[in-house]
Amino acid sequence: MAVKVLVVDDSGFFRRRVSEILSADGQIQVVGTGTNGREAIEQALALRPDVITMDYEMPLMDGITAVRNIMQRCPTPVLMFSSLTHEGARVTLDALDAGAVDYLPKNFEDISRNPDKVRQLLCEKVLTIARSNRRSISLPPLPSATSSSHAPASSSSVGASARVGAGASPAPASTSAAPKRKAYRLVAIGTSTGGPVALQRVLTQLPANFPAPLVLIQHMPAAFTKAFAERLDKLCRINVKEAEDGDILRPGLALLAPGGKQMMVDGRGTVRILPGDERLNYKPCVDVTFGSAAKAYNDKVLAVVLTGMGADGREGARLLKQGGSQVWAQDEASCVIYGMPMAVVKANLADAVYGLDDIGRHLVEACQ
């Protein structure tokens, strides 16, 4: 059965273009279009699509307000289109907090050297998020990142796509044994689709005196990572910044890999930022950072693979395991997309599998 898609944008040209691209894929059926947020809600209720694509800047009602309403009334995976600017990044992160599952730059065809490949990416994203965990996106929206810097985090200060919606049963408790305590020299966390909210959920549980350095690898465009790091820094008690070449790892500091580049660490505790290798699908790539950590710290790394499509992180996890380090994976019930964690689990590389709400607490227990 074809995936039913609702396309919402105030630009007639863009609605037609997105509809043409999606309709060219035999697995996708465009069942309706809308020109603003109000129409998005009306059409979502009437047509019950499997996926909605939506712009964030529209008349009458903006995309973020529409997403919040849709998540409350008929939870549906939403793919947001955004601009590759700092402001576009901020708005996109707000949309993810409101319940959107993924995003693409609005000029996705123009910025690619291979338009055919990026058109295929749009279809792949739609097909993938159509299979996303609806229970994990069905939450009322949460406030945007306006809290004071490093204030204690409350359970309500995190985004929507990681939580269980009204009327749904809670995710099952983690079945893995208590985490092994060890003097870890590094905590490395890798993620993709659903990651911005998942990282927010985990990191806001860490105390300001968290005893280990952290590196974060989130598949994200170059224009977005600085805004995302700033957002996390406002919400978390630990410090968070976008990594720069030469940064020094230190306890209580999380360094986010910059988009479009690769991040590596060395045994002296120094971060190296390298140009993105065109041969790699992801920039930043979880495998690259995990692999460098395995070489630098042997058995002193605690790695966590969170929600995301694909299998990035699996080979890096294999190297970490060969050196004696610990690898955790997020459980299927709490993932938006159970791809990257599943790859680690199926390869028998996960020492523990935890629900998203348990990971932060277990990190504290393991590293104290």
Swiss-Prot record:
Knockout consequences: Deletion mutant is nonchemotactic. Mutant is not attenuated for virulence in C.elegans whereas in vitro motility and chemotaxis are severely impaired.
Compartment(s) of residence: Cytoplasm
Reactions catalysed according to its record: [protein]-L-glutamate 5-O-methyl ester + H2O = L-glutamyl-[protein] + methanol + H(+); L-glutaminyl-[protein] + H2O = L-glutamyl-[protein] + NH4(+)
Keywords: Chemotaxis, Cytoplasm, Hydrolase, Phosphoprotein
4-aspartylphosphate sites (modified residues): 55
Residue spans of biased composition, Low complexity class: 144-176
Example of a GO biological process term: chemotaxis
Annotated region described as Disordered, given as residue ranges: 138-176
A Gene Ontology cellular-component term: cytoplasm
One MF term in the entry's GO annotations: protein-glutamate methylesterase activity
Annotated EC: 3.1.1.61, 3.5.1.44
Swiss-Prot/TrEMBL domain comment: Contains a C-terminal catalytic domain, and an N-terminal region which modulates catalytic activity.
Family listed: Belongs to the CheB family.
Functional summary from the UniProt entry: Involved in chemotaxis. Part of a chemotaxis signal transduction system that modulates chemotaxis in response to various stimuli. Catalyzes the demethylation of specific methylglutamate residues introduced into the chemoreceptors (methyl-accepting chemotaxis proteins or MCP) by CheR. Also mediates the irreversible deamidation of specific glutamine residues to glutamic acid.
Protein name: Protein-glutamate methylesterase/protein-glutamine glutaminase 1
Organism expressing this protein natively: Pseudomonas aeruginosa (strain ATCC 15692 / DSM 22644 / CIP 104116 / JCM 14847 / LMG 12228 / 1C / PRS 101 / PAO1)
Gene behind this protein: cheB1
